[in-house]
């Protein structure tokens, strides 16, 4: 176990031997030239030992760089072989799939060509330029097609006249509903535009009989005029004015007409003013 531990150590225990050999080599090289051939042979041997030692050191350093360095090449080789085998199997399966696809495509092409040959529309197909050409002449419909159309129209005719009866019934119901609607609309009273007017009727002086003045005003009767409440309002110096309310229809009674009718009573009425005017 100790030996295995020392195999992975990076300490160079024999370095002094190689240092001594290298020193002796350089001493002999730098020494006198009259050396014998034996010395030259010894120097070459030393050089070879040094080179071999360096190679061993490099190998030992490379081998001790990782615990799995010795088993690396064999492991890589086995993994490569396994991968190649899996690729070959995958290649074979892909080839089978491609062959199946080619066979399916060839069958489809054969079937399509057979359908095109057997189709009557394919035989009568013309170039598309003839369909869109403005100079193309439209052939009149054949007599046979016209006869078939007439037969279809004859088949659609109801011999018992049920459609006509239904149309008459629908027309009668529609007319009846329109008549009822017109009668209902005629009975409904039309909206009449009306206005509420407050009049100020002023007398000549404080001696004017206000009861007689009010009776004169209320004696004015017009179509669309309705008199309302009234009261006496003091003006000053013992004089009072008549404030009376009325409702008029705008289309029938105008304010000017109403003032003219009231001012006809010159003995009692001095003037008529509109104090308020409101639409109803």
From Swiss-Prot:
SUPFAM superfamilies: eEF-1beta-like. One of its GO terms (cellular component) is eukaryotic translation elongation factor 1 complex. Keywords: Acetylation, Elongation factor, Phosphoprotein, Protein biosynthesis. The modification Phosphoserine is found at residues 37, 44, 60, 86, 106, 119, 133, 162. Residues 113-171 are annotated as: Disordered. The modification N-acetylalanine is found at residue 2. InterPro entries: eEF-1beta-like_sf, EF-1_beta_acid_region_euk, EF1B_bsu/dsu, EF1B_bsu/dsu_GNE, Transl_elong_EF1B/ribsomal_bS6, Transl_elong_EF1B_B/D_CS. It holds the Pfam family EF-1_beta_acid. The modification N6-succinyllysine is found at residue 117. Residues 149-168 have a biased composition (Acidic residues). GO terms for molecular function: guanyl-nucleotide exchange factor activity; translation elongation factor activity. GO terms for biological process: translational elongation. The modification N6-acetyllysine is found at residues 17, 107, 117. The modification Phosphothreonine is found at residues 129, 147. SMART domains: EF-1_beta_acid, EF1_GNE. The keyword Membrane does not apply. Belongs to the EF-1-beta/EF-1-delta family. EF-1-beta and EF-1-delta stimulate the exchange of GDP bound to EF-1-alpha to GTP. This is Elongation factor 1-delta. It comes from Bos taurus (Bovine). The lineage of its organism: Eukaryota, Metazoa, Chordata, Craniata, Vertebrata.
């Amino acid at each position: 176990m100790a030996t295995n531990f020392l195999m992975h150590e990076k300490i160079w225990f024999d370095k002094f031997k190689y240092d001594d050999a290298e020193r002796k080599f350089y001493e002999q090289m730098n020494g006198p030239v009259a050396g014998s051939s034996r010395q030259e042979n010894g120097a070459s041997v030393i050089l070879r030992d040094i080179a071999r030692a360096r190679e061993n050191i490099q190998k030992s350093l490379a081998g001790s760089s990782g615990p799995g360095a010795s088993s690396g090449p064999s492991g890589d080789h086995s993994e490569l072989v396994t991968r190649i085998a899996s690729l070959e199997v995958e290649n074979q399966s892909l080839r089978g799939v491609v062959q199946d696809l080619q066979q399916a495509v060839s069958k489809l092409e054969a079937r399509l060509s057979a359908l095109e040959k057997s189709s009557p529309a394919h035989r009568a197909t013309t170039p598309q330029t003839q369909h869109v050409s403005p100079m193309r002449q439209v052939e009149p419909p054949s007599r046979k097609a016209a006869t078939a159309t007439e037969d279809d129209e004859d088949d659609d005719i109801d011999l018992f006249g049920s459609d006509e009866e239904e149309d008459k019934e629908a027309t009668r119901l529609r007319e009846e509903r329109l008549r009822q609607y017109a009668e209902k609309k005629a009975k409904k009273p039309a909206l009449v535009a009306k206005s509420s007017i407050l009049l100020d009727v002023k007398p000549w002086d404080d001696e004017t009989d206000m009861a007689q003045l009010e009776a004169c005003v209320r004696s004015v009767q017009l179509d669309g005029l309705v008199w309302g409440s009234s009261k006496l309002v003091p003006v000053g110096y013992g004089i009072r004015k008549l404030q009376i309310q009325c409702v008029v229809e705008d289309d029938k009674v105008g304010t000017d007409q109403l003032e003219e009718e009231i001012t006809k009573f010159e003995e009692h009425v001095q003037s008529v003013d509109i104090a308020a005017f409101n639409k109803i």
